[in-house]
Amino acid sequence: MVQLNPNFINTISQELPAHLSMDEFIAACARPLRRSIRVNTLKISSEDFKRLMQPKGWTFEPIPWCKDGFWISYDEEEQLGNALEHIQGLFYIQEASSMLPPTALFTPNADWQCVLDLAAAPGSKTTQMAALMNNQGLLVANEYSASRVKVLHANVLRMGASHCALTHFDGRVFGEYLYESFDAVLIDAPCGGEGTVRKDVDALKSWSLDEVIAISETQKALIESAFLALKPGGSLVYSTCTLNRHENQGVCEYLQQTYGNAVQFESLSQLFDGADKATTPEGFLHVWPQIYDSEGFFVAKLTKTRSVPRLQLEPKLQKNFPFTEASPKQAKAIQAYFADDLGIELPDELIMVRDDEFWLFPREFTDFIGKMRFQRIGLKLADHSKHGFKVRHEAVIALANTQANIIEINDEQAKEYLMGRDIALDTATKAQGEIIVCYGGAPLGMAKHLGNKLKNNLPRDLVKDKVLLLPSQA
């Protein structure tokens, strides 16, 4: 049963808008969340995904603020994270409210080429923005927690987001190291999590106002860093999954008090049909759980109207960047390998080399070389040895399409493949060597075609103990 701390109730009752009922708020907090997912349009259209899943008993209710987001219902009680289609990266299990911040940042006329996600893990909003950018430009995704960087990286790869650069820093350093470098910044700030009580019944058990105020001080430092990293004319979205004013309106007001008319709040009242139900007088979205039957959430958007002074001297450029641009000969060789052996045309991005590794970097990344240490940049394409090139799994997942050198397998074979097993073929044919294994038109990974079977080349760290095949209801 949900645990609502009396001190929290006393505090939040003073902040609840007059047109909303405290009884309805408490009742909403006690209800389980509706299941929601976001279709990964880097791999499949929403219409094709619905056609794929409706025979398996899924029903789809559109989420008003995300054209590729849906509340879903189906009969099975299995963990969706084990579903074949989830492992493939066809969808992301994402709470509906958390789809709001990227939607607010990427309004229809937005054409952001260089975007920062300041607190990115586990990657729901990062991969949502990657899809909105259609893998164009550069998306820098930062995470302070080392263990969560690994989760972020895994989700970025699973979803086929190829234009990301990952960093592992305290978000407060970005204003210094990457001053006025980004067209747009999203900061989904670490917070008290008051809005998450519907999925974590103990979220408010030990709530205290002192802790809320302490968290808000960190948030103020983070939003200031994000604002300094934003180019003049750019947009910043600040969001939390908490409900109190200290961590929400108070943080935004602090930024405006600090930088005056350089901070221009943008109203979100027309972001989607019904947004006005959650709009504050400032134009922010303060989503109470009973309004849309969702998690509690807060979203604010602002424009940086002019440049502001940096707080510290510009840091020195870092030396010894380990990558160099591929020579014309090297670039031609890797392009030919992908085209001739794999049937993949490489995007017109930067081909970079480190030792015997070939990588694909977003062209926009060149402006960032030497300014900060990056954990991961773009895609690792292949390793090179005296025997030639060997493609990397992540490149296949992100770049392969139906025109590539593929073999389509059925669902039972796909399950076997993802569990690391070789696949026996019904009909023996001439051996074809390296081949891309696909299910439902989306790539699973590489195999070696030996004529009568596929020798599994799935990386060992991606082998699954359990793969769920959702049964057809037909």
UniProtKB/Swiss-Prot annotation:
Organism of provenance: Shewanella oneidensis (strain ATCC 700550 / JCM 31522 / CIP 106686 / LMG 19005 / NCIMB 14063 / MR-1)
Reactions that this protein is recorded to catalyse: cytidine(1407) in 16S rRNA + S-adenosyl-L-methionine = 5-methylcytidine(1407) in 16S rRNA + S-adenosyl-L-homocysteine + H(+)
Positions that bind S-adenosyl-L-methionine: 119-125, 143, 170, 188
EC number in record: 2.1.1.178
Main location (coarse class): cytoplasm
Location within or outside the cell: Cytoplasm
EC main group: transferase
GO process terms (BP): rRNA base methylation
Domain of life per record: Bacteria
Protein name in UniProt: Ribosomal RNA small subunit methyltransferase F
InterPro entries hit by this protein: Methyltr_RsmF_N, MeTrfase_RsmB-F_NOP2_cat, MeTrfase_RsmB-F_NOP2_dom, Nol1_Nop2_Fmu_2, Nop2p, RCMT, rRNA_ssu_MeTfrase_F, SAM-dependent_MTases_sf
Keywords, sorted A to Z: Cytoplasm, Methyltransferase, RNA-binding, rRNA processing, S-adenosyl-L-methionine, Transferase
Coiled coil: none
Recorded family membership: Belongs to the class I-like SAM-binding methyltransferase superfamily. RsmB/NOP family.
GO cellular component, one term: cytoplasm
Catalytic residues in the record: 241 (nucleophile)
PANTHER family attached to this UniProt entry: 28S RRNA (CYTOSINE(4447)-C(5))-METHYLTRANSFERASE-RELATED, NOP2 YEAST -RELATED NOL1/NOP2/FMU SUN DOMAIN-CONTAINING
Transmembrane spans: none
Protein role: Specifically methylates the cytosine at position 1407 (m5C1407) of 16S rRNA.
Gene Ontology MF: a single term: rRNA (cytosine-C5-)-methyltransferase activity
